[in-house]
Amino acid sequence: MSRVYDRLESATLLLARAGGIKDRLNGAWRQCLASIEPEDVPRELRLQFLELSQTMQRERPLRGEDAVRATIRKMSNEEAECQSAMIVRMFCRMTRQQELELALPMPASAAVVQLFAAEG
């Protein structure tokens, strides 16, 4: 899961850079997200990731381009912004999930075991 988190973070940072939204989306997808396998994505984000993946490859390419290039070429700037926002929201959701997991208190039985281990 940390690999997916790292990739989403990198994609978000790419999207935050200067430049045209379509160029930034292209870079974020190709450099960070295209190689992620859907089964590696946490279950609560998998459907959203699959939708993004399908959206990014929906257009038929012209000679000399691939489906991603064709799709981004045909996107409006507003649609590219929407897909970019989806990437940022997935990163934020994964960040919140990790924070919740870190904030969970240790079970009382685990604390007792640790105390006994420290005494003995």
Regions found by a protein language model. Give the residues of each.
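Non-transmembrane, amphipathic alpha-helical segments
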Residues: 7-13, 17, 37-44, 71-82
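Short terminal alpha-helical segments
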Residues: 1-31, 87-88
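Compositionally biased amphipathic helical and low-complexity segments enriched in hydrophobic
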Residues: 9, 15-16, 46, 63, ...
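Amphipathic alpha-helical interaction modules
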Residues: 19-66
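Long, hydrophobic, amphipathic alpha-helical segments used as structural scaffolds
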Residues: 16-19, 23, 37-42, 91-106
